[in-house]
Structures are given as C-alpha cells and as structure tokens.
Amino acid sequence: MNNKLNAKIEYDLICIGGGIMSATLALISKLLKPDLKVLILERLNNVAQESSAAWNNAGTGHSALCELNYCPQEEDGSVSIKKAIEICKQFEVSKQFWSYLVNEELIDKPEDFIKTVPHHSWVIGEKNSDYLEARFKVFKEHYLFDSIEFTRNLCKMKSWFPLIAEGRSEDEIMAASRIDRGTEVNYGALTKQLFQILELEFNTPAHCNMEVQDVDPSADIDWTVELKDLKTNEKHNIESKHVFIGAGGASLLLLQKVEIEEKEGYGGFPVSGEWLVCKNEDIINKHNAKVYSKAGPNDPPMSTPHFDTRYIGGKRELLFGPFAGFSPKFLKAGSNFDLLKSIQFDNLSPMFGAFWHNLPLTKYLMEQVTMDHEDRMDELRKFYKNAKSDDWELLVAGQRVQIIKKDDYEGGRLQFGTEVVSSKDGSITCLLGASPGASTATHVMLSV
C-alpha cells in the first residue's frame, strides 16, 4: 500500500490515519463520487496497527445487546434504553454498509472479519438481577431487541456460558440475558479489506510511513498538509479542499495545530487497556459467548468487565478484561511526551476541572496499575470460578484518549465516547474519543 505519492496535485480529501475511520470515509466518498481525488496518509508502516488492530479493541459489534452502561436505571426504578437504541441503530448502519460491499462482490469473505457470537449480560445479587429483568422487559417491547431471552435459572446459564456457571450453586442469586444475533468483529481484518478495495478498485492506496506534521490554511485552496516521508526524510506540502483527522489518540495533537476556533478547550486523558488471554484450547472451546457484567458503582464505563470469545487470525480466542493501565502516550507507538504536549493554555482549566471532578477515576486507575497477575486472576474468578493462573497471560491492548472538554458548571469534564469536531464550513473534521468507536464508523463517517 505504498504507491508513489503525488504531492503536486490538489486533492478533494486527505484522510490522516490508516484506521477504520479513514478507510470508511475514503471508501464511501469514492463509491459516491469515483472521480474524487483522495489521499490517505499513515505514519506507521502498515494500516490498522493502532486502535483498529484486532487485539487493541474488544471486537464487540457494539449494538447495546449486552452493554449495561447504555441502559441506566432511573430514580423511579424504570430503565432507559434511549442510548441503547441509538447505539444499536448506528451499528446496523455499519452492517448494512458491509452487506452492500459483499453484495457488490467487493468483499468476498465476510467471515474473515465478522462472525455470529451470542451476546449476554450477566449479574450477581438481587438488586442487579431485578434491574436486568426490568431491562429485559423494556427490551422485549422494542423491535431491535425483541429476540432477547432472560433467565435466573442456573441450568439455563450452563447452556449459555458453561464456564461461568461452573462451580456455582442454585443458591446463588444471579440473572442473565441473551441475544443470539450478537457479533464478533475483527476490525483489523475489516480495515485491511476496505483499504484493499480502495487500492484495487479505485487506485487509492494508503501511503504509509508518512507523518503529518501540521495542517495550515492555504491561500490557493482550503488546507495545506505538511508531511514527512519517514523513509526518505523528504518533506511535502499537499493541498486539499477537505481534511479528515482520524489518527486515533494522535488526533487531538493534530487538531491543536489547526487554526480553527472550534478546537478551543479540548484536552485528552490517555488510558491503556490490558486483557487476560487464555492459553488453554480446551477452555477456549468451552465458551462461545460475549458476556458483559456491570462496572463497580464508582468505576468508569470503560471498566465494564466482560468475558469474550474472539476470532483473530483464523483462530478462536478467549479473553477477559479490560484492565486499565496508564501511559502518557496517545498511541501505542506514540511519545511519552504526548500528554504533556497536549496541555495548552485554552485547555488547562478544563483539564484541571475534569481531574478534580473525577477523583474516583484517578483512584480506579491507581488500583489498576498496581495489580499483579494474581490480582487480575481474582477478578477473572468472579466470572470463571475455576480459572487457573497458568492458563492465562496478560496482553497489552490499545491506547484510548478520553475526551476532556469545557463545562460551564464544572470547568471541565471527562467525556466517554466519540465526538466529531468540525470547522464552521466543514472543510476540516477531526474525530476524538474512543468506544463505541469502530462499530459506529459508517454512521459517524456519513455525518462527516
């Protein structure tokens, strides 16, 4: 994916970043208007190496079938599914786009990136079980979720997820829900297929080893992108009518260099993820489910524990997590100075406000980074009681940069999810944030 870069022409669109967001936007643009001049730039030596890489995310097709943080319980005891409906519809748009590519024979092996894996929610305790049943009843009335099943029966749970049910007694108060049509998605494999379509069908390859150093207004056209070829050390100034910054955690650092007022006040807080990954194939083959539970009362949504079947590189896998780590880097291949460089005068107050009003998050991160292998195994055993330490190893996942933005009441707040920041005229757009991320790529890129 390294056809020679043509720096002399004026482009209609430059996509910065070689992940699923840039791939989706570039492909939609070329499908709608094949004569558009599109340039894709990636700093690393291949695409889909950061957040889109298979092990760097959970691989869940986020459709709110099992993620309980999308269904808060109100003070009157009712369960709101407004956010769940929104997330589910957004993922359906992504599936429709991928189905279109399959029907047009642009993708010939969808099974290489998407498989059906049932999605479950599972909770312990009377209060949590009552909540899950209330959620089930509301879900059952909505067409997006009407295939949902619910049980408090241990025997039924054994048929759904035998490893979790193993070693438990009928006296334990538990509840679970299930939707069969859940998905497991290898976003790394998908991203590479999208870039392959762009290269083979539209002669629009991703140019790797290209580091974007600045984006400036241009006198002749809207924007000039300054970049460096990391192989030759050559520098280029390339002009484009539109620019999309989809560089994962590094998007914030690039946005801060762009001369638009909409960037003011944004900051970021990096959090790394870690998984426990099973090494025992006999154990792996006993579990065919994605099982999400509830985060602790003071823990952030990103801490929601889950026990998941994955398919990566043609092999079935089993993981548990996430566990949080801390690194000042905004990307796995980033710099230890990323966080420091991101602190500027206009976001100093929001960042301080976000820190001050999120002390429980700081406490949570401190507890997480001091965990050893047995501490993590103890967390796993809350799901899988008979888990043996020697069957599991730690794997470091991707970096996430949570959004910090101005807040009139608190000065600044930490925001989970993704956000699109655009100039008034829409000529430059930047995607910030994390989960549900890749699942909503098509919806988000259509809005861009």
Regions found by a protein language model. Give the residues of each.
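Glycine-rich FAD pyrophosphate-binding loop
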Residues: K30-A54
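Flavin (primarily FAD) binding-site architecture
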Residues: I245-I260
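Core beta-strand elements of the Rossmann-like FAD/NAD(P) dinucleotide-binding domain
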Residues: I9-Y11, K231-H242
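Beta1/beta-strand and adjacent pyrophosphate-binding region of the FAD-binding site
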Residues: L5-M21, L39
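Flavin (FAD/FMN) cofactor-binding and adjacent substrate-gating region
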Residues: D108-V117, S121-Q196, L200-E201, P205-H207, ...
